[in-house]
Swiss-Prot record:
PANTHER family: DEOXYRIBOSE-PHOSPHATE ALDOLASE (PTHR10889:SF3). It catalyses: 2-deoxy-D-ribose 5-phosphate = D-glyceraldehyde 3-phosphate + acetaldehyde. This is Putative deoxyribose-phosphate aldolase. Pathway: Carbohydrate degradation; 2-deoxy-D-ribose 1-phosphate degradation; D-glyceraldehyde 3-phosphate and acetaldehyde from 2-deoxy-alpha-D-ribose 1-phosphate: step 2/2. GO terms for molecular function: deoxyribose-phosphate aldolase activity. GO terms for cellular component: cytoplasm.
């Protein structure tokens, strides 16, 4: 550890100066994961989720949710209805709010207009930067981020280039995320790794690091459009990267699993994982979100 830490601090310093050294990146973040160790940990988290299940924890889960609609038939009335629900998800308790409402860029202005007219507040998340494929020119990705922020998005969810990741071109992955981060201005950046398309856990770890080094405020598992979305396996790897970053720099990066999380028990498994790897200080909406469209329904059944 004594020899690794100064090297990585130097790498972090140089990366933020725009010098991404590939050899140093590979030396510092290239690692393999023990599948048996991960499987044992996941079994523990799933059991702990059952023990966590109570009304207080369910209320906390609701506050982690980025309440999402990302469909081709989304209309102004549909996203406004979603925003109303995100602001007051539990009718009997107006103090509870979802983490944000998440919509396509074209619908940001609809949510913003509703919030202004009703004098209500909510974080507005928008997917941008070539969502969900990432197969766009960088200029168009950056422009979409800029337009989304101008329309009122307070949080931007971009997606990395899986093509670059699978080609092990981590410098390009990093540089594209960095360009989008700069375009965000004061908006928070959540970077989606689309882990279901990265093939290996080592790639997930490297993608996590490339995204963190580029200044991501959160790293997120999935777009929700892949054939395999959030899993506890990739969450374990991503949170391991976040933990290592915090150990070395003292800086905290958030974590967002998304895609296919529909039940309270599933959500609480991620809560148990984050609690174990990152600690209680991560269990708040500033550092932990869950991207979901139907999870709220199951939460309300449990209250």
């Amino acid at each position: 550890m004594a020899t690794i830490v100064p090297t990585l601090f130097s790498f972090v310093r140089d990366t933020y100066k725009g010098r991404f050294d590939v050899a140093t990146f590979e030396r510092e973040v290239g690692r393999d994961f023990d599948n048996q160790e991960i499987a044992q940990a996941i079994s523990k988290y799933e059991q702990e989720a059952k023990n966590l299940r109570n009304k207080d924890e369910i209320r906390k889960v609701i506050q982690y949710i980025d309440l999402t609609t990302l469909n081709g038939d989304d209309t102004a009335s549909k996203v406004v209805a979603l925003a109303k629900r995100a602001i007051n998800p539990v009718p009997t308790d107006p103090s509870i709010h979802c983490g944000s409402v998440c919509v396509y860029p074209q619908r940001i202005a609809d949510v913003k207009k509703f919030l202004a007219s009703s004098k209500l507040n909510s974080n507005i998340t928008s997917v941008a930067g070539g969502f969900p494929s990432g197969q766009y020119h960088l200029k168009s990705k950056v422009l979409e981020v800029e337009l989304s922020v101008a329309d009122g998005a307070t949080e931007i969810d971009i997606v990395i280039s899986r093509a670059s990741a699978l080609d092990e071109d981590w410098k390009t992955v990093h540089d594209e995320v960095l360009a989008c981060k700069k375009a965000c201005g004061s908006a928070h950046l959540k970077t989606i790794l689309a882990t279901g398309e990265l093939k290996t856990l080592s790639n997930v770890y490297r993608a996590s690091w490339a995204s963190i080094l580029a200044g991501s405020d959160f790293i997120k598992t999935s777009t929700g459009k892949e054939s395999v979305n959030a899993t506890l396996e990739v969450a374990y790897v991503m949170c391991t990267a976040i933990k290592r970053w915090h150990e070395l720099t003292g800086k905290k990066v958030g974590f967002k699993p998304a895609g296919g999380i529909k039940t309270v028990d599933e959500a609480l498994s991620y809560v148990a994982l984050v609690k174990d790897i990152l600690g209680d200080e991560w269990l708040n909406p500033h550092l932990f979100r869950i991207g979901a469209s139907s999870l709220l329904d199951d939460c309300l059944k449990g209250l």
